[in-house]
């Protein structure tokens, strides 16, 4: 099993360490910048690049949503097994936080009824059903069986959709005015198919997907750059992707949109 050393070092230090370790470690190094940080200067661009997506989304769901006298219906697009391991902080930056996850799950279950949609998985006991969010007849199939969602959540799924604008239309179609949509998707990330990898989105791109079908009340929009300097090289068990022609990748930006649907146009 390979081990990793992440260091902020000079080239001469790197060569010395490499020799001393006798290649037992793969060294992920950054000659000039510390892991997790980067040098930035003032920019004329007005986007927010200080989002911590899972923390900020939890804050919105658990603290900022209006208090109601009923549990809210929460639909996850691309749910997999429905464990929401990143949102609930079971895994954060590759580190397991079991205690946090259990607390977050307990809080989640007091506030929400969970429903999941996945193209490869279903489990009636967890309210997870087969479905293609890009299907032209999705609305008809959905509304005949499931409640109108109060929240629609999708974590790093839209880049894998061949027709993400159809997904946006279907989300608006099954929702009501006031439904919260929470979308995260990569702006800059290496190629990773699951089963395919089609798109990257700017913060404005996520808004544009929905703008033809509804107006949005924007609550959070911008980028999570906390993983910007992490090098997902691959080639080890549990790696993000296998090694490919890109080699190292050090520009991991994720676009985030939290908004409420207003003035449906259909």
Stretches found by the model and what they are:
Residues 54-63, 99-101, 114, 243:
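Short alpha-helical segments and helix-capping/turn motifs at coil-helix boundaries
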Residues 69-192, 203-207, 259:
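Conserved SAM-binding loop
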């Amino acid at each position: 099993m390979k081990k990793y050393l992440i260091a902020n070092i000079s080239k001469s230090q790197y060569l010395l360490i490499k020799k001393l370790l006798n290649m037992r470690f793969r060294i992920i190094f950054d000659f000039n910048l510390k892991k997790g940080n980067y040098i930035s200067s003032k920019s004329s661009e007005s986007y927010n690049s200080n989002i911590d997506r899972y923390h900020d989304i939890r804050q919105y769901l658990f603290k900022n949503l209006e208090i109601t006298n009923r549990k809210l219906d929460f639909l996850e697009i691309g749910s997999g097994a429905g464990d929401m391991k990143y949102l609930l902080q079971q895994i954060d930056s590759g580190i397991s936080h079991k205690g946090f996850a259990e607390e977050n799950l307990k809080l989640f279950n007091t506030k929400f009824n969970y429903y999941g949609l996945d193209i490869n998985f279903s489990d009636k006991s967890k309210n997870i059903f087969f479905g293609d969010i890009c299907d032209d007849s999705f609305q008809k199939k959905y509304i005949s069986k499931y409640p109108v969602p109060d929240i629609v959540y999708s974590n790093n799924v839209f880049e894998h959709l061949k027709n993400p604008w159809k997904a946006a239309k279907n989300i608006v179609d099954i929702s009501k005015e006031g439904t919260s949509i929470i979308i995260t998707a990569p702006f800059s990330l290496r190629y990773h198919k699951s089963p395919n990898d089609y798109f990257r989105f700017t913060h404005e791109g996520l808004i544009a997907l929905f703008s033809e079908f509804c107006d949005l009340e924007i609550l959070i929009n911008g980028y999570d750059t906390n993983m910007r300097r992490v090098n997902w090289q691959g080639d080890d068990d549990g790696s993000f992707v296998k090694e490919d022609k890109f080699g190292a990748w050090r520009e991991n930006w994720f676009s985030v949109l939290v908004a409420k649907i207003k003035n449906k146009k259909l």
